[in-house]
């Protein structure tokens, strides 16, 4: 395998996210195919790290360069960011960080700019202390776009700084123990026998946080389906849903299938229909079902038009993990900060309400619908459910909040989990 310059690959990945609006989960895997297994982790660290601290790196470039890099030289802008990130946030020796970053100019066919890159990075090293002192008083220090900061400040006047701080951390690795194979405690013993350790969640019975992240192939019984990687807060959805054997259950917006398989672990005799609008992502649902040795009906379909994929069918329980801004999982997907726009929130809220209204008639009388998002914004959460309850006379809220303040909102970092919202509705 030809030796690749990781800094240039990271710069290209970040450029595709920020300039072209592509998701890092789509951009990164093809680039990782080009590098050795040893280098995959560093490439990922550089991409995630630059996107996590982008506001800081952009601020530094504006301070140290008189004019922005544009056109075909734009990738160099991101290459310099990769250089700053290494000097500030990694243990890579500065001389190696500088040399590899400067060499990255050759890999992106801009060798004439090696001197410029070297000069900017060395200037930063000389002025680092003064620059960081000034940065610490700027709005950029929060590492969030200003539109999102304003929304968080308005919705959480006393908590917004804690939310921002949690969003800027590296996420822990949560697992879901498959209760059809092992209890959480018995699998934890296997984990400890393998030289690792984990900590159980206080509320969600299958959730276990690893002491430090590990590759999945090192986890006891991963290939056999004994355990799944899933954040604790995502596991809350099925706790609220409380599926039972023999029931017909709809998992709507199901990809990549983590909640589909969790439903089947909790109720192995349930009949589950998993539906998602994104055909490509449905392949992940099949993969998850196969690894865990489970069966469900999987269909491509738009939640706004259920008659197209389920006819007149009605369900005992529906889990609607609605499309949302994903503002609760920024620490896990830092590209979200730069992919979302303020105007997206109203559009997402409209889509959520359309799906809720369309799917409600497909819930049996006496049935349960759990509405969930990985957002922290009230427009997508409590306000969404409040409006739905007002226009839907046969819907009643149960066990999640109050009619005036419906739902349960987990904030990022609470018991080390992601930000998530849940509302449990019963059809009268």
Swiss-Prot record:
Catalysed conversion reaction: cytidine(967) in 16S rRNA + S-adenosyl-L-methionine = 5-methylcytidine(967) in 16S rRNA + S-adenosyl-L-homocysteine + H(+)
Compartments reported by the entry: Cytoplasm
Database matches in Pfam families: Methyltr_RsmB-F (PF01189), NusB (PF01029), RsmF-B_ferredox (PF22458)
Active site feature: 374
Gene Ontology molecular function: RNA binding; rRNA (cytosine-C5-)-methyltransferase activity
Residues binding S-adenosyl-L-methionine: 253-259, 276, 302, 321
GO biological process: regulation of DNA-templated transcription; rRNA base methylation
Top-level division of the source organism's lineage: Bacteria
Keyword line: Cytoplasm, Methyltransferase, RNA-binding, rRNA processing, S-adenosyl-L-methionine, Transferase
Disulphide bridges: none
Enzyme Commission code(s) on record: 2.1.1.176
GO annotation, cellular component aspect: cytosol
UniProt-listed HAMAP family: 16SrRNA_methyltr_B (MF_01856)
Family (UniProt): Belongs to the class I-like SAM-binding methyltransferase superfamily. RsmB/NOP family.
Protein role: Specifically methylates the cytosine at position 967 (m5C967) of 16S rRNA.
The protein's name: Ribosomal RNA small subunit methyltransferase B
Source organism (scientific name): Citrobacter koseri (strain ATCC BAA-895 / CDC 4225-83 / SGSC4696)
Organism classification: Bacteria, Pseudomonadati, Pseudomonadota, Gammaproteobacteria, Enterobacterales
Gene name of the record: rsmB
């Amino acid at each position: 395998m030809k030796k690749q310059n990781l800094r240039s690959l990271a710069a290209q990945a970040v450029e595709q996210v920020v300039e072209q609006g592509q998701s890092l989960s789509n951009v990164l895997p093809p680039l990782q195919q080009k590098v050795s297994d040893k280098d995959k982790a560093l490439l990922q660290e550089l991409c995630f790290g630059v996107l996590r601290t982008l506001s800081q790196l952009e601020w530094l470039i504006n301070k140290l360069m008189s004019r922005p890099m544009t056109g075909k030289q734009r990738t160099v802008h991101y290459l310099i960011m990769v250089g700053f990130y290494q000097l500030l946030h990694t243990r890579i020796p500065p001389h190696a960080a500088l040399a590899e970053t400067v060499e990255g100019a050759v890999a992106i066919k801009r060798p004439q700019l090696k001197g410029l890159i070297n000069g900017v990075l060395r200037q930063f090293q000389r002025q680092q202390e003064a620059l960081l002192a000034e940065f610490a008083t700027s709005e950029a220090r929060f590492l969030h776009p200003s539109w999102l900061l304003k929304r968080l400040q308005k919705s959480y006047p006393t908590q917004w700084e804690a939310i921002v701080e949690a969003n800027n951390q590296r996420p822990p690795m949560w697992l879901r123990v498959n209760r059809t194979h092992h209890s959480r405690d018995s699998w934890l013993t296997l984990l400890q026998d393998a030289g690792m350790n984990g900590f159980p969640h206080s509320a969600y019975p299958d959730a276990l946080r690893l002491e430090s992240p590990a590759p999945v192939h090192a986890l006891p019984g991963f290939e056999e389906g004994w355990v799944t990687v899933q954040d604790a807060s995502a596991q809350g959805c099925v706790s609220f849903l409380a599926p039972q054997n023999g029931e017909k259950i709809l998992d709507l917006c199901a990809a990549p299938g983590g909640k589909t398989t969790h439903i089947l672990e909790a109720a192995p005799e349930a009949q589950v229909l998993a539906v998602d609008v994104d055909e490509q992502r449905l392949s992940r649902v099949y993969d998850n079902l196969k690894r865990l040795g489970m069966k469900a009906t999987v269909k491509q379909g738009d939640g706004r038009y259920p008659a197209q994929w389920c006819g007149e069918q009605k369900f005992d329980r529906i889990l609607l993990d609605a499309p949302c801004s994903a503002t609760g999982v920024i620490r896990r997907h830092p590209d979200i900060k730069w992919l979302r726009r303020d105007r997206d929130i109203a559009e997402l809220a409209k889509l959520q309400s359309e799906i809720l209204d369309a799917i409600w008639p497909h819930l049996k009388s006496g049935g349960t619908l759990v509405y969930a998002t990985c957002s922290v914004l009230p427009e997508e959460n409590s306000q969404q459910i409040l409006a739905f309850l007002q226009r839907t006379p046969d819907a009643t809220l149960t066990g999640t909040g109050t009619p005036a303040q419906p739902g349960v909102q987990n904030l990022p970092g609470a018991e080390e989990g992601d930000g998530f919202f849940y509302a449990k509705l019963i059809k009268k």
